[in-house]
């Protein structure tokens, strides 16, 4: 019972430290076991353990239940626990001291690393949030344990608790998809913590979330570590420990003094990972400080609203066309796919960086497909590098590395004379060589291959996993003592074989048949090595020795003298006897001992080699950068040619301003044109803010562009399913691709880079549990109004669709006026035709209206969609056209149309027979206002004033009420004419 009491004590401590989703695994002999009580809270835990690991629960001790598995299956069950979101605390037995156990590892979803995992990354993140008097500050830190890369970010936002408050946090989570998240909050209620997990998608990607209240010591066992993470003395010590003594001089780390909460988050996270597995933070890279990057801000959940990545409902198993990332990711290596995702999700604002990508893509456009078969052979070199740093790389991995080095060397030799590629590699290398005589990639590959091949037999390494005793794979000449042992071992085996052959010959003297190998060399893990034969044959052997009067014989090339008189034949199994003697026992023992010594030395040589290989990390980083860059280049060239994308043109800023704009010709939606292969995709031309001076340039060169009088905003009208939202998304996707350095799905695109994209596309409210569509819309609109500039792109779909019409129209028009005043680029899909006649809308001179039409073809009984943008708002009765296609009753449709004509129809749709004649002249009808053409006429105005008429009602020679002297006007125009005497529109 003392063992079980110790188990429960350690388990209680583990749960208090690592959270309620924690299991303790204790090694007992050859098994790892988990215990619980037959009743009480511990019973539920053991039942959950058995369910997760698919194990049976045993009741061998009264009041105690247990479950377990063999020690060699530890990694298998650790993986099951990680997938289910549990932390496993493992206590293993000491190999030398009986009944002595110690903590051997803590494994959680974000700190578990295995070479067999097919995932591109495994991240653990720490989010530190604090609500202050007037703002909310969020510090974020992330570590990818597969690659050793880390990143940090800090944002200050409004105090309001709403989805848009956590926009940057949502982007951070979407970009890194951590499997484990630590949430440290201050001044947050439990409900608010639950909300922000839903708002940001933490609940969708993280298998384990630790919620720690920085202000409540009674509910937080880690409060001491949280408080220490705030103190600079601990921060400096941790940075120096994990990033080296020169960390304080690093540009990125020096920035931490300006970003307090990001520093605290990274400090706590580094300590958290170190306590789980110290090897995981060994030689991790200095963090990328995202606040200092030139990335474009993708606000209001743009990544998901534009389908750049799968939304929460897009299953991870979604097809190639479930997101832009999946469609465009044609990388052949895990490293390439990992870095391509980072690039696509963090588009740049730097024109120079974009131009560099366009130039190299143009240079390599038709050559990189030849690289794809070679790149497909490469394994995850970043993960290999981390496993080497962690000393967890098996010989099989070195065999794969050996082959990969040959592929990389071949690739490098193929492009070594290509000056533009060489310049690009140097410009994009985060750690360029520090000396002029630094080794080239091909030289590094050749040297490492030589080192591997001269140390190990690479063919044998291919079959050696984590058990280094499977075979001897170290080459001769590496260790003299190993070579001596091998010779001794081989001699002993040869002698044993010669003894067996001699005994075989003696037995066969008494046999009628001449079967070979009647004496077997039998080997077991527990029993060791021995000679065995059947009982009948061992009797024959004894008879032959006696008959021939044999006592001692010299056997083998080394003339081993074997004493036959001391042979005995104890029972081995039911059918066999063992053939043994003191001399044979010593020979067999020497074979076992020498074999074990060989295994020990092989393991020692291998461990020393891996330690030596760890010193080559700069060279590994050089190879990783080269292989990753080659894969990224082939990917961007491959998708450009495969999908017929074009090179974007970046417009330069000139004296007319620096406002962002775009001019897209032949714009396509890259996903829809792949999904709908039955019809040809209808491309559109869309240009906003491009100016009269826009030019497509030559060869993608930067060209000057004036602002001109081109519209900077657009309203798109049309029924649902006609393609409004798809067109809006296509614009956002094209801009993101262009600023990520990719070719775009257009026939041409000229643009000036944006710093921010805001989106508001319907269907987003499912992200925010408990909030209505209208609340979400207004939260996102608030952010747009507060942050939009003339370098922002706003993409909206049916804004204000979640409230009643009067409020919707008012809010929408006010929003358009604000965006027009700011000078940003904006597009909205809308059904609000009534705003076309508003004075406030008429004043928006840099906003245009377009429409996509749909009509019902009665003869074909089908809706005909014209997906080409047309000028103006178009007809306002497309809903009735859809109703016709659905065969609603004719009487119903006629009544609906009558209601529309009476209350909602624009003047142009009202029949002439509905117009009333003027009381001045029955031949003059009060139809549509002849001045503005947008309202029905309420007044009839005399062009030559009535006051000038004589007693005969003539004005000069013109009758006062002549049709030519009468003008039908709406009330507003009538008032304006009397005030200004201006009859023009």
Protein language model regions, located:
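Short, flexible, mixed-charge glycine/proline-rich loop motifs
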Residues: 916-925, 959-964
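A conserved P-loop NTPase coupling/switch region
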Residues: 31-32, 36-59, 149-151, 171, ...
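Histidine-centered nuclease catalytic patch
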Residues: 932-966, 983
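Short Cys/His-rich Zn2+-coordinating modules
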Residues: 907-920, 948-956
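Short Cys/His-centered divalent metal-binding micro-motifs
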Residues: 965-985
